[in-house]
Structure formats: C-alpha cells, structure tokens
Amino acid sequence: MKNLIDFGILNLSSIAPMMVLSLFAVFILVLNFINKNISRTFWTMLAILGLAINIFFLFGYSGIVRGFFDLVLIDGFAFISMIIILLFSILFLPLTLSKENFHDCSLAEFYALYLFMIVGYEFMVSSQNLIVILVGLETSSLALYTLIALHNRTRAIEAAIKYFTMGALSTGFFCFAIVIFYLSSASLDISAISYSAKNTDSILIATACIFLICSIGFKLSLIPFHTWIPDVYEGSSEVMAGYISIVPKIAGFIVAMRVFESLYDSNIAFIQISLYIIAVLTMTLANIMALIQNDVKRMLAFSSISHAGFVLCAVVIGTKSANIGLFLYWLMFSFANLGAFSVLWFTRNKQNIWHERFDHPFEKFNGLVKFLPYTSFLMALFMISLAGIPPFSVFWGKMYLMGSAISSGFIFMAVIMAINSAIAVYYYLRIIVCMFLKEPLENAEATLYKQNSSNAIKFIITFSAILCILAPFMVKFWTDFVLKFI
C-alpha cells in the first residue's frame, strides 16, 4: 500500500534542533524516575550537552530550510536568534551550581522544563505561520511559569501567578489577532497576510494588528503592557530573572520583526506610528521608574524594560541596517545583563538579612569593595556597560541603532535614545557609588556575601566581564556574521 505521507516532503531535518532538545528533556524525566539520587551537576551537564548538540545541528544547515509544508522556516532571522537563545541558555545553566542548595535547581524537572521552554522559543522564531508561533509561545510560556514557581517561596508563587495572568492576556490577544487575520486574508502565513494587506483596505487587518501589538507588548514587557513585570523579577530567582530579561525577548522581537516589518508597505500606516510611540514611552518611563527603585533587582527589571524600548526602535525603523543593529544591541546587552544578575546570584542569601522584603537593597552593596574587591569591580564594569559608556558592550549597540535611526530619517528617535542613555547613567552609577564610596552596614561581613558563591558562578561572571571588555573587537565580527544571513 502506498504511503499517505511522504516524509521527504516533510523534511524532518527542519525540526531536528527541537527534536533533540525534546528527547533530552524526556530522557531527563525518565532517568529521574529510575534514579532519584542523581546530582544537579549531572542534570546541568546533561542539559548543556543537549544544547551544544542543538547548536551543532544548526550549523549543519546550508541556506534556507523549509519543512512541514512551509510551516517551519529556518532562515537568517531564525538561525541568528536561535544561536543567541542557545548560547545564553547554556551560559545561564552553570548558575544553578550555586553553593546554597536551592530547591528549584536540585529538581530534575527544572532541567526538563528548561529544555522544553527552549523548544518553544525555537518554534517561535522558526516559522512564519501564526499557529506555529502560538504553539511555540504557549510551550515556552507554560514551562517558564512553572520554572519561576519552583523557586518555592511565597513571592515566587506570586510572581508565577502574575506572569501567568499577563501571559494569558497576551495569548488571548494573539488568538484574537489570528482569527481576524484569517477572516481578512484566508491565511495564517505572514507573507500571505502582508500580501492581502497591500492589496486591500481592510479594517479587519488593522484591528488584528492592534491585538497583535498588545500581545507582543505583554511578551516584551513594553509600556503600558509591563504592569507586573518588576514584581515577577523580584519574586523569581536571580537565575530566572536574568533569563527572562534576555532569552524570551529575543524570540518576541523576531516575531515582531516578521509581522510588523512585512506590513509597513501596506495601507495600515498606524502600525509604525504606534510602535514608535510605544518605543519612546518604554525607553523613557522605564528609565524614570528605575531612578526611584530601592532594590537592585527591581532597578535591573526596569532597566531591561528600557533596553527593550531601545531595541523596539530597530523594529520601527525596519531597515536591514536596523535589523543588524537589533542583533548587535541584544547580544551586547545580554552579556552585561548576564553578568549583573550573576553577581546578584553570587551575593544571594537564603534568608532576608538585609531587608524585610528585598534580597538586594542598595544598602546591601555599601562598601562591598572592602569585602569583595574583584566582584565589586566586575559589577561596576557591568553597570558601566549597561549605561552605554564607551568602549564597553552596550555602547556599540546604541551607536549602531542611533546611526540607523539617523540614516533612515528618524532624527527625533535618535535624540530620545541619547537623552534616555544619559538618564540611565544615574541609576547605574548609583550602585557603583554604594560599592566604592559608602561605608558598609554594621552587620556586614565578607561571609554574608559569599554564602551562595561557587566556581561555576565565578566563571560566568568573569566570562561575561571579558566579553564586555572585548566588545570593540567583537562588533565587526558579529555584524559581518549577521549580514551573511539576513
């Protein structure tokens, strides 16, 4: 009997990276069922191995790869974003090997969910079909909510519930957008929707775009959709808070680039204008809120929101140069933010000994240089990098984006970016002042800052610092690498 399905047409190699990670995740669960006494070091190394093999499969592709009747698309955007997703997913894993044995990091389920979450992000960035993007979005989101809740304290449960609520709203808006797009264009493929928008003056597509902007706004923590995001960061472990600030957002930006940039030439002029306004509001208001925070983790939460506003400017501009700038900016920001959250994790205590609510009040870092000089200097480096002070990492991303804005005629946008960069310097320098110019608290001693230290965390902090310093030498290599694929 003739086969009904031609597996050659499906091109299973197009989902090889997702299949590899799914198999590793299932293997972790089965192995844990057989033996409950396996250490977290083994789980960490196994997860890193799965991610490394995933990267190997990615570099095995040559050119654009399509599969499953064009539902899966591995193009330049997908390839570059998956490299970033996998790279930082690998770099966050050693942070689980902390000195303190936190509940979530010792569970095999944590590592399985971690891999399933990454599978979701890979599907999000490797498709132009809105249903596949939705499946990836939900797969990653449900795993992420659980990972936050596994931290096993009241505020972590609260953070997970708040994030779940925001995610549910995002999914609802996304589903509304999908339904309306299908009604207007009879397709869920982004290119077909774009074609329909260019050839019809449909109020339906405009309405769908409004819902989609709201949905992606929640996922990227853009103002006014950011709502509970600072509370989510505060309640999450430093590992997951740092991860939330980097990996989910690059997946969201790729979806935004695919959808919105394809619609700029249509009859729907308000899309670009709306994103422009949201980008300016996100940069500015998040910066202002960061100025008044009393906790370093919450400050970094608003800082991450502001940086998302900067990167959204690349989507607004919509040129090839701006798209390259997006990848450059996010890579440079990610190294600095990884380092900053790693330092917070390094100095984390299980008990709230510094403040009745916060784990990392600014006062905690008073005089830190006297106890941890090496860590203090590296934290200062990360703050200077995030502030965009030359010649460190984020400076190059900001310069590239500002150059793209000016060359494309977005002069006002470039001015707003420059003003917000100046505002951000204050709250980044604030922690440097605490570490180097203020006297330590009376109960402060070196052992209190080292209770969660480990060689793995020290390695990630040092590695991030080296990359922030070497940023000037990485810019041309990275931009040339990205240019080959987009």
Curated annotation (Swiss-Prot):
Q: Name one GO cellular component term.
A: plasma membrane
Broad enzyme group: translocase
Q: What is its EC number?
A: 7.1.1.-
Transmembrane regions listed in the UniProt entry: 14-34, 45-65, 77-97, 105-125, 130-150, 163-183, 203-223, 237-257, 268-288, 299-319, 326-346, 377-397, 409-429, 459-479
> Highest taxon of the source?
Bacteria
Q: Which reaction does it catalyse?
A: a quinone + NADH + 5 H(+)(in) = a quinol + NAD(+) + 4 H(+)(out)
A biological process from GO: ATP synthesis coupled electron transport
Q: How does the protein's chain sit in the membrane according to the entry?
A: Multi-pass membrane protein
Q: In which compartments does the protein localize?
A: Cell inner membrane
Q: Does the keyword Protein biosynthesis apply?
A: no
User: What InterPro entries is this protein classified in?
Assistant: NADH-Q_OxRdtase_suN/2, ND/Mrp_TM
Keyword annotations for this protein, in alphabetical order, are:
Cell inner membrane, Cell membrane, Membrane, NAD, Quinone, Translocase, Transmembrane, Transmembrane helix, Transport, Ubiquinone
What's the chief localization of this chain? membrane
Q: Which PANTHER family match?
A: NADH DEHYDROGENASE
* Similarity remark: Belongs to the complex I subunit 2 family.
Listed under subunit, the entry gives:
NDH-1 is composed of 14 different subunits. Subunits NuoA, H, J, K, L, M, N constitute the membrane sector of the complex.
- What is the stated purpose of this protein? NDH-1 shuttles electrons from NADH, via FMN and iron-sulfur (Fe-S) centers, to quinones in the respiratory chain. The immediate electron acceptor for the enzyme in this species is believed to be ubiquinone. Couples the redox reaction to proton translocation (for every two electrons transferred, four hydrogen ions are translocated across the cytoplasmic membrane), and thus conserves the redox energy in a proton gradient.
**Entry-linked HAMAP family:** NDH1_NuoN_1
What name has this protein been given in UniProt?
A: NADH-quinone oxidoreductase subunit N
Source species of the chain: Campylobacter hominis (strain ATCC BAA-381 / DSM 21671 / CCUG 45161 / LMG 19568 / NCTC 13146 / CH001A)
